[in-house]
């Protein structure tokens, strides 16, 4: 009996050992399968876990960052690293095994970062509850961020710079191009849209400013959300809002609905600049960041060139239109508005193929997601360089301890909108708190200085770039008025006028039994004249007025001579029949003036190309501050040449000069803003500063254009003073060249 019992016990122990070994191997196979499924970016059947038979050839690592660097002690003991096995004492798989994440108790011995620098703690010491209850001190969090920044920079160097970054460059370039297009759309369509929508001068002014107002709101909104919800997600939503309402604005008929659509379109595109620069910078190593962010700025110029070229090619084609009665009209300028939404639509489609920023994942404690994205970057670049066999060696990356999370409530608590309301309030509170932290003791001085630089730059740049075309139009008007023909005291009887009268003044004339049929009047004025027994039929006019005139027994049939065109005039026994329908306001429509707007904008945006190239090549060589201050000083000097601009050609040349030298300061300012703030505040601060930029633009445009036709001294003085102040403030900012991204 006793011998049989011993045999039975031995059999049971052997069965348990076999079952345990089978379970172990089955678990490893499952993990390998998961790793291959998750490794969709490398497109090769490579597993990060070595076969057990190969353990002697590939010893397990002793730390949590690299493979293939095991210790002799582990080999002799027959033990495998938790970083590669992922089993506890009971042979259970723990969460994160497939990512190669070391267990907490295994990370305390000899952990090191990707560049070999020592690093204390387990799993970054961030999620195991160390530190005082209720959160740790700010000094500890600052230390964590510095360690993460150093390790992240080393990982980006290992990933290299190649196909992935260039693909992302063109994708984000489309989003930046959409922002450049948005700035020009309203200005290009106004000469045509004012007739269809019957826009007064105040309506046109509001339409021009509403876009900047929308972009100001959008920059602050999407910039704040991108630090909480993610760069890619917020950029997709903001571009979707822009494209949807840009599409609607091409079809709506009323001024109010068009204004509303352009406002929301501006809100959508407002998130483009803050998110795009922050997003792209987090995939760039330190030695590439300044140059490639400057190359990215070129897409804003391409957006302006695209808008000007499309306006030139589409709007003058009046045949590209249709109408359904008098209620609905779709003219060529609406086609232009539709075409201007294409960059945003294409950017949305391309952005869906790109991953979220790994730096955002790490800042929010999402280690596994960040690892997968960085592995995608590494494998994409290595395949493109002809080294597909190179393996991404990093297995563990530091993450930041999260002290606050979005409030979650049970699904059966209240209604769905109450739950969403709670989450929205929580998110809004976090965004606002993050914004206020930009004015905390650590960043208050930087933020205030950056506010001054952004405001002065935007005030002078946008003010002058809008003032230039207005000055050109004023010079055109002065030249046009100098060629006005005056006909005094003429007497005309029994004559039929069926041609065009343009740029003429008729004073003291007498017209008896005359017929004005199919006549077109453009910038014609009749003063102190008499019309008796005359007949007006199918007459169209623009900028035409009858001042102190008398009409006796005169008939007006199917004309657009509305009441406001008769200034202090008397109509005795005169009749108006079937007046033309449409806008009763006097609009100039499209013509040479509109072509000049397209041409000037095209040249002005194209002129920044040399400045873009120079700034990109020198950004990492001379530094951000020297580039910003030097370009601002050169822009300030170029302002003094404006006093010599007394002709159209001279003003166009000065516009190109100013744009060419000022673009370098904008590029440097964008790079500096990205590098001065940490990753958890980057888009929030950038969005706020960009919103301030749009506010300064509105003020600059309003002030500068008020001096058109009065004096050139005031705009020159304001712009020069603002640029000088901005350059002096810029020199007091810290230089960020050569620093890792915080």
UniProtKB/Swiss-Prot annotation:
Topology relative to the membrane: Multi-pass membrane protein
Biased composition, class Gly residues, residue ranges: 122-137
Stated family: Belongs to the major facilitator superfamily.
Signal peptide extent: none
Renumbered residue ranges of the record's region Interaction with SYT1: 1-57
UniProt cross-references to PANTHER family, sorted A to Z: SYNAPTIC VESICLE GLYCOPROTEIN 2, SYNAPTIC VESICLE GLYCOPROTEIN 2A
Extracellular side: 191-205, 255-262, 316-334, 469-598, 648-651, 709-712
Protein name: Synaptic vesicle glycoprotein 2A
Phosphothreonine: residues bearing it: 84
A GO CC term attached to the entry: cell-cell junction
